[in-house]
C-alpha cells in the first residue's frame, strides 16, 4: 500500500514539474495543424506533418488535430467555429492557401480576453500579439538545385514545373533555378511550364513527359508531390527530389539529388513560446552555418562526381556567409535591364546596377532572356471514337442492303405486269422498299461521326422510314381484313387512292411528333465525360436532348407500338384465310411479329444502363435486322414466283377455280338466313389480265343473284386491281359497264327487261343447275 501511495505522489510531482517547466498545463494545451493536402504525398505536406509529430514528441503534447483544407473560404469555414468554441491554444497554418483566412481570424481576436489563440502563418510581415509568420529562403535552395542540374545534364537541356501565379506562387523560384544552371553552364537550354496548382498529378505527369520528349534529361519542380519524379524514373532517367521530401530514402539511386526540409527546427521554438504564452516572434529558415539551425538537408546519388559535389558545397558555403539581399538571385548583371522592363525597384542599399530590392524579388514572374516559357499546361481531352471496324462494317452492310433495295425497286417496276407483283399492288411495294431505303440510310448516319445535324437527321430518317414501311404493311393488311370480313358480299370499294391517305396519315403523325421533338427537345451533340469506361481526360460524342425531347421520343415510341399492335391485331383477324394465293397476309403478319419481338427486346435494353457504344451497336443491328427481315419476308416469295413461273404468271393458282372455304361458308350461312332472296355470282373466274394499278375491289350489286364464291372473285377483291378498267369504261363510255365474261345459262337467267316506264319486278326462276 505504501508503494502505491509513493508511486501516485511521484507521478503528481512529475506532472507538477512538467507544468512548472513550461508554465502551462500540457494536458489541456490544444494545437491544430492545417495542411493543404494529405500528408502521405511524399512531399511538402509529409515533411510538415513530420515536423509537427517531432514537436509533439519532444514537448509531450497530446491534444493535437490535423485538418486538410486549402483556400480562403474553406479554411475560414473550418477554422473559425473551432477557434470560437473549442478553446484552441495554437494554430499552425502551413500553406500559402491558409494565410488570408488565418490572418483575418487572428485580427478578429487580437487583444481578446476570452480567446487566447495564437496563429502561425507563412510569410514575412510583422508579427502581432497573436500572430507570427514563418518564411524560408526558397530561392536559395532552387538556385542550388539549378547548379546541380547545369552540372549533371548530358543534353544541356533542362526543364522545370511550377504552380505559377494561378497556383499561388510567382515564378521567381523558376528564375532562381534557371540562374543557378545558367551561371554554372552557359550552354544550357531551359524550358518550363506552369501547372496552375501545387498539386495536380495529371497535369504534372503529362507536362513532364512533354519536357522529356523535347530532350530534357534533368527536370526540377516546386510542386507538392513527386509526380514529376515518377514520370522521369518511368522513362529511364534519374530524378531530382525538389519538393522537400527525402526522396532518396524511398527511391534510392533512381533519385540522383534531393533536398529535404527540417521543419522540426522551425516549429520547436515557436511551439515552446506558445506554451508559455510568450509574445509571438517571426522565424526565418535558410542554409545556416550553425548545423542546429540549418533548414535544408541535401543528399546525392552515388554516381554524382565528387567535383560536382565540391562545386555545390562551395556555393552553399558562399550563400551561408552572404546576406540574402546580395545572393546571386538578387544581384547579377541581368537584373537592371529586367527591372527596367518590368518596372521593378532596384536596391537602395546595395549596388543599384545589379541588385533588386528585396521585396521586389517576389514580383519576378516574367521569363528572363534565355528562358523558354510554354505557359500554363492544359490537358486536352482526348476523344474516344466509335469503333472504326464496327462503323465500317455497319456502313458496308447498309450500303449493300441499299443496293439490294434499289434493285428490288427496279425488279418491281420491270415485272409490274406479272401476276405475282400485280396481285400485291406495285405502288405499295415501292412504298415499302422506299421506307427500307430511308431506314438503311439512317443506320449509316447512326454510326457516323456525330454533330448536331447528324443527331437530328438520323432520328428523322429512321422514324420516317419505319413509318413508311410499317404504315404500308398495316394498310395492306387492313385491306385484306375488309375484303374477307364481308359475309354479305356487299360492294367494297378499296382503290389505291383510298389507301394513300392512310399511309400519308402515318407519315404526318410522325412528322408532327418529330417537329415537336426538334423544336423543343434541344437535340444536339455534346462531348460527354465521366460516362461508360472513359478516362478522366477522355470524352465521347453523344446525342443528347432535354426532358421535353425525351417525353416526345417516348410518345413516338408509343405511336410505333400502337401502329404495330394494330397490324398484329388485323393480321390475327385474317389468320383463317385458307386460300394459298393470298399467303401474303401471313408474310405481313410474320413481318409485324418479327418487328414487335425485336422492339420488345430492344426497349428493355435501352432502359437499362448501357455503354453508349454498345447502345449504338444494338440499335444499328436491330434496325438492319428488322428492315431486312421485312423486305425478305415480303419480296423474296414474289420474286421467286416471277423467276419460277415467268413474267406472265403461268402458275395455275391464277387460273384455277378454287373456292375459299371461309368465304363460301359465310355466303351459304347468309343465303340460308335470307331465303326467297337468293343470289348468284355473276363474276365467274376473273383472270389476272383484268388487274390494273387503280383497282376497285368489289362484289356485284347486292340485288343481283349469285351462285358461288370462287377464287376468281376473291382474287379480284384482294388484288386492288380487278375492276379499274370497268371504272374507266364508266367514265369514258357514258356509264356503259363492260362486265366480265359469264356462262350462257347465267346470262339467260339474269336478263331483265328495261321498258321506259319501269314495270313491276319480274320474278325469274333460276336454273336447277344454279340452285346448288
Swiss-Prot record:
Name the record gives this protein: Metabotropic glutamate receptor-like protein G
Keywords assigned by UniProt, alphabetized: G-protein coupled receptor, Glycoprotein, Membrane, Receptor, Signal, Transducer, Transmembrane, Transmembrane helix
Cytoplasmic topological intervals: 413-426, 485-500, 573-586, 638-772
Similarity comment: family membership: In the N-terminal section; belongs to the BMP lipoprotein family. In the C-terminal section; belongs to the G-protein coupled receptor 3 family. GABA-B receptor subfamily.
Range of residues in the leader sequence: 1-23
Location, primary (coarse class): membrane
Comp. bias intervals (Pro residues): 754-763
Region (Disordered): 664-772
